[in-house]
């Protein structure tokens, strides 16, 4: 099915608009804005980009740790997105200015309760957006107040790169540097490249970083 996740996104948004699903005021406003944008001729929906990101995440990434509500271990199982996460991706990379390939949103603030996969989502966004924008030479930084928090996302991606056999040291396409000086991964592909690096917040040293994707974990805005 070409846009197989679109009905899921619409059902999620409709359930909030109708009141079937309990939601906070800000989420209700986000849903109303979403429906207004769909009817606004100033924007168009790029289903292909949104589906690319969703399917890249669900078909290449697996959980590194965690359990289901019933205690079933998640490690090694596919990283399947919840409807609200698909709604986020359709908004972020699907909605574009009319007659252009420019996304409407260049910044997102995502509030998620504790122990609901914020870091996994941050890493999944870094991975999928980096691949989506590979033709432009994508560069992504994941920053946190402490390097240890940034490494949660990096280690999640590193685990998956190794699991897929894509680490360059094993003959794969992704060069990984993971030592005391640097935590990064990069790949040059036939139609582009991407670079992802984990950083600790350091305003004195990071004022000149040049990237098209920036993710701050625990505060969780995404810029591109």
Model-derived segments and their meaning:
Residues 1-224:
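Phosphate/NTP-binding elements of NTP-utilizing enzymes
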């Amino acid at each position: 099915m070409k846009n197989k996740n679109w009905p899921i996104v619409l059902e999620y948004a409709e359930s909030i608009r109708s009141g079937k699903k309990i939601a906070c005021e800000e989420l209700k406003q986000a849903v109303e804005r979403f429906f207004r944008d769909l009817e606004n001729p100033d924007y168009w929906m790029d289903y292909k980009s949104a589906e690319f990101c969703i399917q890249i995440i669900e078909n290449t990434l697996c959980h590194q740790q965690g359990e289901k509500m019933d205690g079933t271990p998640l490690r090694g199982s596919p990283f399947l997105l919840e409807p609200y996460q698909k709604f986020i991706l359709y908004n972020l990379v699907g909605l574009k200015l009319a007659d252009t390939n420019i996304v409407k949103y260049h910044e997102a603030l995502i509030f998620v309760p504790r122990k609901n996969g914020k870091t996994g989502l941050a890493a999944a966004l870094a991975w999928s957006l980096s691949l989506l924008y590979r033709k432009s030479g994508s560069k992504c930084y994941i920053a946190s107040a402490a390097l240890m928090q940034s490494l949660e996302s990096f280690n999640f991606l590193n685990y998956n790169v190794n699991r897929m056999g894509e680490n360059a040291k094993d003959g794969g396409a992704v060069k990984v540097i993971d030592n005391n000086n640097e935590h990064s991964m990069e790949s040059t592909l036939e139609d582009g490249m991407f670079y992802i690096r984990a950083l600790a917040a350091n305003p004195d040293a990071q004022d000149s970083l040049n990237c098209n994707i920036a993710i701050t974990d625990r505060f969780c805005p995404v810029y591109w």
